[in-house]
A protein has these predicted regions:
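A short, well-structured juxtamembrane/interface segment
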Residues: 41-55, 185-195
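A charged, amphipathic alpha-helical module
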Residues: 147-205, 209
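Phosphate/oxyanion-binding active-site loops and adjacent basic polyanion-contact surfaces
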Residues: 34-46, 67, 178-185
Length: 234
């Protein structure tokens, strides 16, 4: 059974890790042993990813940076020939994306409604963080922020209902700057995804650590013609 296999893997790996840990610091040796004990979890996750790739008929697998890079190494080590029980597995690549790099490009417009997607996850919003999310230089809007009574270091509770933030988004100069920034970021992301083989019409598996799937949501909005199947370890 698979359980017996994992028990065997653990029994084989732990003694090897103890031997390999000799000469290391106590902290390093403990970390090495912990990794060996967790080997069945990592291997089981990679095996499940391969099974899902076959069952879901996925065209390509993407492991998101940065946590996904480790699992990409595990996956490639387990399936060096790209096959599982006689089935061909899709290509597996690392995709350098983050919540920040995919959110702004996925926005339809510069509006409070679009921002509420991220505010539903985080109930507070720092003013400086807002500008970083939108890809804007906050220094260019110092006068406007002062007029609206918004300090750069301020943290706003319930941002969706903030009068000051609503006024900010309704200011033509700010709205135009956001629109231009979104266009540029969308163009850059679209070019990167195309270069990475991710286009509309494909079936893609994505691998990451977590449970919210925020990046997957952003990607699905940005490439609506693609099918995404998320595989997470949370």
């Amino acid at each position: 059974s698979r359980e017996a296999l994992f028990d065997h893997i653990r029994a084989e790996c732990v003694p090897l890790a103890r031997d390999a840990g000799k000469g290391l610091s106590a902290k390093q040796a403990a970390a090495l042993c912990l990794g060996a004990q967790a080997a069945p979890l990592f291997i089981g996750f990679a095996l499940w990813i391969a099974e899902q790739a076959v069952l879901q008929k996925l065209d390509r697998l993407y492991f998101f940076t940065r946590e996904g890079e480790f699992f990409h190494r595990v996956f490639c080590a387990l399936f060096p020939q790209g096959r599982l029980s006689g089935y061909d597995l899709p290509p597996a690549d690392i995709l350098e994306v983050s919540r920040l790099s995919t959110f702004a490009p996925s926005m339809k417009d510069a509006s409070i409604q679009e921002m509420s997607r991220i505010w539903s996850l985080f109930k507070v919003q720092s003013v400086s963080g807002l500008f970083a999310t939108l890809g804007l230089d906050i220094g260019k809007f110092s006068e406007l922020l002062e007029t609206l009574g918004l300090r750069k270091e301020a943290v706003i509770s319930d941002p969706e209902n903030s009068v000051e933030l609503r006024q900010l988004f309704e200011t033509p100069a700010f709205a135009e700057a956001v629109k231009n920034s979104l266009t540029i970021q969308a163009s850059m992301l679209r070019s990167y995804l195309k270069q990475s083989g991710l286009n509309a019409g494909g079936r893609f598996g994505i691998v990451d650590i977590g449970w919210r799937g925020t990046i997957q949501d952003n990607m699905a909005l940005f490439v609506p013609g693609a099918h995404f199947h998320g595989m997470y370890l949370g």
